[in-house]
Amino acid sequence: MTLAELNTALKTITGFSKKVVYRAWPVGQAPPLPFITYMVDDSDNFGADDIVYKAINRVNIELYSKNKDTVSEGLIEALLESLSIYWEKDETYIDDEQCYEIIYTIEV
């Protein structure tokens, strides 16, 4: 899967067609919560003999919401499972923004 394909897939989630962006919204242009951002965080390439045989990007998909949003979390998880993408999940509360951040880490 490419990043463009991931972007398209995330926009198919009910309620998020215009609430998905790579990395961050321009200052002052973020839509109301909830919304999704995604970005390449790292790589975990497969290689040998000083050659990369398979480039693998580690991508964070971040769901931001005012309250704990198990419905949106379930929709993201169902999408990833339908695409046969293994994911790990982490959660934090951002005091300055007064919102929850759910981070899904995947590899593409």
Predicted features, each with a name:
Residues L80-Y93:
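Low-complexity, intrinsically disordered Gly/Pro/Thr-rich segments
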Residues N57-E62:
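Active-site-adjacent structural patch at catalytic or cofactor/ligand-binding sites
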Residues M1-S43:
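Small/polar-rich, solvent-exposed N-terminal microdomains that initiate assembly or binding
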